[in-house]
UniProtKB/Swiss-Prot annotation:
Keyword Mitochondrion among record annotations: no
Compartments it resides in: Peroxisome
GO molecular function, one term: lipid binding
Coiled coil spans: none
Annotated organism of origin: Yarrowia lipolytica (strain CLIB 122 / E 150) (Yeast)
Record-linked InterPro entries: SCP2_sterol-bd_dom, SCP2_sterol-bd_dom_sf
Note: Expressed essentially in cells grown on palmitic acid with small amounts found in cells grown on glucose.
Name the UniProt record assigns to this protein: Fatty acid-binding protein
Length: 129
């Protein structure tokens, strides 16, 4: 089932992330990401119409990716809130997470260092877009 949501152009990225984590050739990276992050990360994205949607990335248990502000296996350890456009730019390598954070365009609730652990997963998604 697709994680794409109408009105959120970047939502297709969550399908790409899920497919990458489920790819048997990426099993080593998946295990490393889970070990490094050990967190459930929720992405709260706001589109141009002002609507907010959430997706989770469970890097605490099994590398699951899904729709919603909570994994079936636990609450979020980290919440990242940003616009749909900025998330797309971040994954495409056109925006810098640190710069978005410093300018208030990326809000982080929880352990900022654990949030940095998803960099490899986003980079892999960028390569598969």
């Amino acid at each position: 089932m697709s994680l794409k949501v109408d009105g959120f152009t970047s939502s297709i990225i969550f399908d790409v992330i899920r497919d990458g984590l489920n790819d048997p050739s990426q099993a080593k990276q998946k295990a490393e990401s889970i070990k490094k992050a050990n967190a459930i990360i929720v992405f709260n994205l706001k589109n141009k119409a002002g609507k907010t949607e959430s997706w989770y990335l469970d890097l605490k248990n099994d590398g699951d990716v899904g729709k919603g502000n909570k994994s079936p296996k636990g609450d979020a350890d980290i919440q990242l809130t940003l616009s749909d456009d900025h998330f797309q730019q971040l994954v495409e390598g056109k925006a810098n997470a640190q710069r978005l954070f410093m300018t208030g365009k990326l809000k982080v609730k929880g352990n900022v260092m654990k949030a940095a652990a998803i960099e490899g997963i986003l980079k892999n998604a960028q390569n598969n877009l």
